[in-house]
Design a protein with these regions (language model features):
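Substrate-binding cleft of secreted/luminal carbohydrate-active enzymes
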Residues: 17-40, 54-128
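Pro/Thr/Ser/Gly-rich low-complexity, intrinsically disordered linker/stalk tracts
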Residues: 106-162
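Beta-strand signatures of extracellular beta-sandwich domains
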Residues: 165-167
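Short beta-strand/loop segments at the ligand-binding rim of alpha/beta enzyme cores
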Residues: 1-5, 53-58
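Amphipathic helical hotspot of TIR/SEFIR-family domains
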Residues: 42-45
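Flexible internal linker/loop segments at domain or repeat junctions
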Residues: 1-15, 22-23
Length: 167
């Protein structure tokens, strides 16, 4: 709801994502929060306060680490990561993947060594029942003659609600 350099989706294109979250229209939102300093933290807090008990996964602008963009110091992204964890948002997303894979300013190393040292569990959808879906049985992937892919699986009945399976 805060204007971002004079623009926001609520006032310009009439999108009220916070209302959609509260009404249960969306289960998760990945807002593009490609800002730094005081242009970042109020937005993160606003999303937390108005999430409607749904997932908010802020998109962090790691492309700004590039000298060809705004040449942010790595510490800017690190502070944003700590802050989004401190206020208990539901993870982070990154734009653009190329800067992560190229390890721009050591972002990949930083994340791997200090933030994502173990596999992450998907946050619970507390507005749903507490039992996660079963792992599909007998998955199959076929290449069709027209070049399309056909994916199928059998419904599994082994769900006891207590196991975590890593694939």
């Amino acid at each position: 709801r805060y204007p971002s350099r004079g623009w926001n989706a609520y006032h310009v294109v009439y999108q009220d994502a916070q209302k959609w979250l509260k009404e249960g229209i969306h289960d998760a939102l990945f807002p593009m929060m490609y800002f730094q300093g005081n242009n970042f933290y109020p937005f993160a807090l606003d999303w937390k306060e108005n999430c409607g008990n749904r997932w908010i996964v802020p998109g962090l602008g790691i492309y700004f680490l590039s000298p060809d963009e705004q040449n942010w110091p790595l510490d800017e992204i690190v502070r944003q990561l700590h802050f989004t964890r401190q206020i208990k948002l539901n993870g982070q997303a990154y734009f653009r993947n190329r800067f992560l894979l190229n390890n721009t300013k050591g972002i990949w190393d930083e994340l791997q060594e200090n933030f994502y040292t173990t596999p992450a569990l998907i946050p619970p959808m507390t507005w749903m029942d507490s039992i996660p879906p079963s792992t599909p049985a007998m998955p199959s992937l076929q290449l069709l003659p027209d070049g399309k892919m056909h994916m199928s699986w059998q419904i599994s009945t082994d769900n006891n609600g207590g196991l975590v399976t890593y694939h």
